[in-house]
Amino acid sequence: MRVTRRHFFFSFFFLFLFALIFSSCALEKAQTLSSQNSGGNNSQGTTTSEIVGNDITPLSLNNSSVTVPLEGGKEAILLVVSADPLSSVQSFQLTTPQNPKTLTKFLSADTEEDTEEDLHMLLRNLESEIPEGTPLAESQTKFLTRYLKIGDSRDFKVIKSFTSKDEYTVVTATLVYEHEDFEVFLDSRDLQRLSSSEIQEIFDNFAQVLPKEFEFFGEPSDIDKNSKFTVLLTQEVNKMGELYNALVTGWFFGIDLFASQVYPASNGMEIFYGMVPDPNGEVGPATHDLIMKENIIPSYLVHELQHLISFGQHVIKNKTMSEANWLNEDISHLIEDIHPPRTDSEEIYSENYMVETGLENPSRVSTFLADIDRVCFLGCSAGLQERGGGYLFLRYAYEMIEFGILENLEEFLQRLLDGKQIGLNNLKYALFGDESADQALSDLVGLFALTIYFAGSDELSDPLFSIKGINLRGASSDNRGTMLNGPAVISATQFPLTGILEGFSMAYVKVSGQDIANQGGELTLEVSDSKRFKAYLIQ
């Protein structure tokens, strides 16, 4: 019954949506980027705050094509949305009466490799190899830490790479912070990298976040029976970044919950690891001190805690697989928004506690928007661009629940971690209460794509076309100077124009009024599979 109500709502909502009229806003200087164009050539796609047109028309793709008559002299945006749960590569083509060539065979999968190695995927792959019935760690940690006080030390194991469950380094770390829910150890070699006052401030703020994160996602498992989880800050995390030529900020690894007789690198406790400040690059990639202490550490604390909770819910409690890496990362980025603003930690207890985005999220979203037609943001990989888009979608869905479009905020968040499904099935179950709700997800993705285009416009007051936690056309207060300028728009300068979209992705194609007139006053859109596409004309 719940899914039926939502399907009725989406049908009603889109009828309402298509009647809305939007106005354009001021043009800001555009940033140039490459986007795929006809014949595999590169056209110039641009991110810009310009809003073209004032009408939205849904396009019916019966028989995999639609011809649209256009008013001469008016610019148009054609929004093409791929909503393919199989994550396959689909093609579309724009033709005109002057250039009517059609595809005899749509392009096959020929996607670019993401050159950024997905390091967390290596850990998730190792976790997926843990056999069912592997013995959990015995309750030894409570004995080891029972008599420790601030300033005391103990040894920990830290893995040497993301490809082995067995090789590790032993580090000695000092207890620097204690709380009823967690304890913090700092590598004894790194005690000068954080002052006692900085430690106090960082983890006092983190402690205030915990009740909300536990409320949303549940509490961590407690295999060591000490009612706490452990945070280990160590230069070994920084060194991992040096090893992989990347910035590795932290990790959780599920083997720590299992017996060390099976996995020698296990610490036998709920633990995650984080990097230490290193502005001079002495032990790994150099990190700006302000960004490290105000952005990175607060972000990875809530981020890695979500991974720890998720693993406990899926694997320990529900006896299922660990969450798909792409969704696991997207959820962790969403939970970063719970971290309180730097100047007002009480904000998390108000109704507006997610009014601001986490400090590290705008830069991720920026990479997504800049290459939006090349990014599969749901169900594919967990690269930086994909995570930027996946996070933004979860943020949007979260706000749609706040507005009453989707039901039950707490159920949505709890289902994400406590369900027995993973990946897209888990996402559909969390959103709609039904893991087979493909059409409902497709409808929401279409609305999301329209929102990305219109969000940030001063002309729109309807909250349905905004993402209040992040301005998609404005400066971000993220200590990085990130400027978001809307999604990349491809200018169609020749026809036929062919595009490729993978899984859940979208492309914004702009046609000038002069080109429309020169091309006979109409466009034909053809797609490789009408069941996988949605399309909208904006004029």
Residue ranges and their predicted role:
Residues 53-133:
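Long, charge-dense tracts
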Residues 178-324, 331, 335, 342-343:
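Juxtacatalytic substrate-recognition/specificity segment
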Residues 46-65, 69-71, 421-539:
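Beta/coil-rich, acidic/histidine-enriched accessory regions frequently appended to metallopeptidases
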Residues 304-311, 332, 386-407:
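Alpha-helical scaffold elements that line and support the substrate/ligand-binding pocket
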Residues 1-23:
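Sec-dependent bacterial lipoprotein signal peptides
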Residues 295, 299-300, 318-390, 399-400, ...:
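Acidic/His/Gly-enriched intrinsically disordered linker/tail segments
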Residues 81, 106-177, 181-191:
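Acidic/polar low-complexity interaction segments
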Residues 19-54:
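Bacterial Sec-dependent N-terminal signal peptides
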